[in-house]
Amino acid sequence: GSNLRGVCYVLDEPTIGLHPRDNRLLIDTLRDLSGRGNTVVVVEHDEETIREAGHVIDLGPGAGLHGGRVVAEGTPESLAANPESVTGRLLAHPLRHPQRPRRAVAGEAEPGAPAWLHVEGVHRHNLDGLDVALPLGRLVCVTGVSGSGKSTLVRDVLYEGLARLLAQRPERGGEAKEGVAREGAAGVRPSSATRLRPRRRTGGAATEAAVLAGLCASIQGWGEVARVLEVDQTPIGKTPRSCPATYVGVWDTIRKLFAGTPEARMRGYGPGRFSFNVAGGRCEACEGQGVRKLEMSFLPDVEVPCEVCGGARFNAETLAVRYRGLTVSEVLALPVEEALEVFAAHPAVRHALALLQDVGLGYLTLGQRSPTLSGGEAQRLKLVTELARARPGEPTRPGVSAPVEAASGQRGRSSPHTLYLLDEPTVGLHMADVEKLVRVLHRLVDVGHTVVVVEHNLDVVAEADWVVDLGPEGGDGGGRVVAEGPPETVARVRRGSHTARFLKGFLRERGVQAGGRGKPG
């Protein structure tokens, strides 16, 4: 409502968390500000916003070491004609959907139908008596305008309800099962069900109604799920000691490789010598962190490279040992894509590094400090760690553990059927990164898991096997299911669903014919 002119407005990803309907309203507001004689500078990944801009500056061409320069600038049309611009390529040739054949979701009474999870009688915030069914072993998207109850359903009810039920599940030994973890807590690594953080146990068996009190009346079909895991964009660690190599589980193997070199054996060094977390081989001046923190009175603390090791983390004696011509410090400085070549002969390391490369994180260095990772990078690291546990070609069945190949390359651990919950995972992701994220989600489902995503991004919604749209509005005007089914079915809904209206045009433009199966029988 301001009539100011000559103002420079700077906005950093203002479309975060907005439904396509609200996104259109935001763009109209920005155009109005610009039309009044103001300058509007927006940092944005949203395709619609980029297409509406009068001038676009594209940085890249890649991420990390491969970026940092202006590769194109001008109108969106000129960007689309620039072969060096990844953004321009996706403007000229948007993603087509579905990228892979959609998994069939038959009704429960039909042969070959997947197991279903029924959440009944939800009473939470604006959800009043809601009943919803989700197919297991599928990629499920929960959509709706802001405030329609999506996060309440998925995080407050589905996650919390399954967490309580799984904590009550008896093991063979009679104890409650530890099958719950809210991934995203700093330093918490995805792991097998027996290593996950347990919920507080109640004294004795409780009825399901008592366990779910305050959430919903019942959750049917939860016995098919062995684990529930929320994967968010919070940092994987808050100290320089945490890095991609330690998080995905390859650093122990790399340390053993260094300990097995002739020089290390001659000096009597074991794997512990090449750890920056324990005394012996690390630089004691910085305790293996490579930096020292200077406390500034009345100012934020400042980190500077260690003056003793110069940021190498290890002492001179440890750095005298080389593996394929590289010191342990130089290995930590290797980008994933280069480390793949160095450790190509070691399946234990190659498998996890190849997954990092596949999801677009090949530019990260093995020793990059976790606090410097973006939210999207941290989230993909967590998903890669989960993928590294699942052996390709041997999918799980709901409720059944399948043999897997761990990051160590050894077979024998089990991959329990896991329900992954992600709340708007595309926040902060470029269109090219969204494509990579979708591939990761599909791979998790391909090995037998279930992925439930709260999302506004239509590139993700169009890839789902099943969509549940809440609404029709936010707050008191929402809280009910207005459409459900495969994306093509939801797109045919004519009334009550804002998502259907935008999804219909999106699917028409991206080469998908309207048509699909209906609601389960």
Walk through the language-model features, giving the residues of each.
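Conserved phosphate-binding elements of NTP-dependent enzyme cores
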Residues: G1-G521
